[in-house]
């Protein structure tokens, strides 16, 4: 019988599109973690930039996090994996890179996590507060944000929210992960965008002292984008309270090369 190449080379296909909300499905969660390939360069960014920001280490100037990467760079996959590890410590040992697995101990299982994808005409404040109230109710926390026209600033409301959360879940944090964030910002009109950016700045500011963490995925570095020059002043204030982590095409090339190498090893050593 003639053997076909397909009989020799078998490997897990690379998903063309991974959605953040896939991480909410138990049957997909483990697969997302075990199939995430990490280069040494990516491990450096995760271990030195992302995990310290997510951790509760008081020596760190905590900020919001923007994961920047065009379509196909693994942005949603990375956010899914990080949020799963933060939610459940058992996933940390499944990470393929030993340095990342070691660094992940600082966040493993230390958060209640809420993941959202934004495609709405609501204000950013309304989206975030509505989603957080749904999240809090799910986790047995009674809290409602005051109406937008009843607050001078939003930081006090976040402090009250985290105090209520800590009563039910002491020693844990809240991690809000948002995808499709750039598309949402692009859709906003000038005045509305300024208000959204002001709220985003406040989110970055509350991360400094509270156990609240915010991670969003964007397709380009918004602080350097010409399409947002009309709100440059607002963006500068946001930039001070956010860390940008850049993903590149070479990260995808490494994933493909690793998958093919694994397949080649199985051809040479099929046992």
What are these regions (language model features)?
Residues 1-29, 109, 119-123, 131-132, ...:
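Extended alpha-helical interface modules used as scaffolds for assembling large macromolecular complexes
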Residues 1-73, 85, 234-244, 258-264:
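Walker A/P-loop-proximal flanking segment of P-loop NTPase domains
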Residues 25-31, 110-157, 178-190:
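Conserved P-loop NTPase mechanochemical-coupling segment
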Residues 61, 83-112, 139-156, 218, ...:
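Flexible phosphate/Mg2+-sensing switch loops adjacent to catalytic phosphate-binding sites
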Residues 63-70, 75-77, 112-114, 171-176, ...:
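Beta-sheet entry/capping signal
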Residues 78, 82:
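Hydrophobic positions on the alpha1 helix immediately C-terminal to the Walker A/P-loop
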Residues 101-122, 126, 202-271:
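Conserved P-loop NTPase catalytic core
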Residues 165-195, 217:
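Conserved P-loop NTPase "ATPase switch" module shared by AAA+ and STAND
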């Amino acid at each position: 019988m003639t053997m076909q190449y397909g009989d020799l080379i078998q490997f897990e296909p690379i998903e063309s599109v991974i959605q953040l909300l896939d991480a909410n499905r138990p049957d997909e969660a483990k697969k997302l973690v075990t199939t995430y390939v990490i280069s040494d360069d990516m491990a450096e960014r995760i271990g030195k930039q992302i995990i310290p920001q997510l951790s509760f280490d008081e020596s760190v100037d905590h900020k919001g996090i923007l994961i920047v990467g065009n379509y196909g760079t693994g942005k949603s996959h990375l956010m899914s994996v990080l949020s799963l590890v933060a939610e459940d410590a058992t996933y940390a040992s499944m990470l393929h890179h030993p340095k990342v697995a070691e660094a992940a101990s600082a966040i493993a299982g230390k958060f209640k996590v809420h993941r959202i994808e934004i495609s709405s005409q609501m204000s950013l404040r309304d989206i975030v507060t509505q989603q957080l109230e749904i999240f809090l109710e799910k986790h047995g926390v009674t809290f409602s944000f005051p109406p937008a026209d009843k607050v001078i600033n939003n930081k006090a409301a976040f402090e009250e929210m985290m105090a209520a959360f800590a009563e039910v879940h002491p020693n844990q944090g809240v991690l809000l992960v948002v995808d499709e964030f750039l598309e949402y910002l692009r859709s906003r009109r000038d005045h509305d965008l300024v208000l959204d950016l002001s709220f985003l700045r406040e989110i970055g500011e509350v991360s400094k002292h509270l156990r609240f963490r915010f991670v969003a995925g964007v397709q380009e570095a918004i602080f350097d984008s010409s399409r947002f020059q009309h709100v440059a002043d607002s963006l500068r204030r946001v930039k001070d309270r956010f860390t940008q982590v850049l993903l590149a095409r070479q990260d995808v090339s490494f994933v493909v090369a690793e998958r093919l190498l694994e397949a080649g090893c199985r051809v040479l050593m099929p046992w």
